[in-house]
Amino acid sequence: MALVKVKPTSAGRRGMVKVVSPNLHKGAPHAALLEKKTRGSGRNNNGHITIRHRGGGHKQHYRVVDFRRNKDGIPAKVERLEYDPNRTAHIALLCYADGERRYIIAPRGLEVGATLVSGIEAPIRAGNTLPIRNIPVGTTIHCIEMIPGKGAQMARSAGASAVLLAREGTYAQVRLRSGEVRRVHIECRATIGEVGNEEHSLRQIGKAGAMRWRGVRPTVRGVAMNPVDHPHGGGEGRTGEAREPVSPWGTPSKGFKTRRNKRTNNMIVQRRKRK
């Protein structure tokens, strides 16, 4: 994996930085693990826009990723590493000894030909999945379950990881990348190591068209709109905001508290670090 700075042959490509992974599979994905993916374009069931700046983009198939890793004791060989347009991490195609194939999130350092296994007797090696009660304290983990058997929900994006801090009774404490310390049941499963494609955050998109390929539409300033569309809209010629900065629905957008006074999650031991 390497960062490639693109030559400034045009204004759009000036400053563009790509993440190149030469070890990724260049052919088609495994057809049996593909599903249809429809786009909502930010609309709800009434057709109203609920998320702005979404629409268009390249057509994609959803890759069915195994987040449960419940084929215990059956070794699996890594056939290839693949790009997945639906997530920031890369995925790996596993071929189990019984012939079944599954996709998993590719951990850092995983190579084609490696053998992975899951279960309580799996060795502590990157890519293997075990219950948290069988993982040594201090181990770096990713793809962590929040409910036993539900499948991994935490630390799944590129470069993500967590650290197993302690075990107390039926719960363990895990420190996430955000600094949050969270309680997780010891029967929940986690995968050893950290997620690969860790240089993903260093890329530079470079041009607006590349964001349109990803289904992201432009963000229009409120002062450039009409009064019917935004509180900052209207006026003759170029005008300022004429009031405190607000959202299109009138909510102050600079430091205004919007969090509801809801019950605190008792699984959070220590809150994440504030920026």
UniProtKB/Swiss-Prot annotation:
Claim: RNA-binding is one of the keywords in the record: yes
Residue ranges the record marks as coiled coil: none
GO biological process per UniProt: cytoplasmic translation
Keyword Ribosomal protein: yes
Pfam families found in the cross-reference section: Ribosomal_L2, Ribosomal_L2_C
GO MF entry, a single one: rRNA binding
Keywords: Ribonucleoprotein, Ribosomal protein, RNA-binding, rRNA-binding
Disulphide bonds in the chain: none
Subunit structure: Part of the 50S ribosomal subunit. Forms a bridge to the 30S subunit in the 70S ribosome.
Name assigned to this protein: Large ribosomal subunit protein uL2
Source species: Bordetella petrii (strain ATCC BAA-461 / DSM 12804 / CCUG 43448)
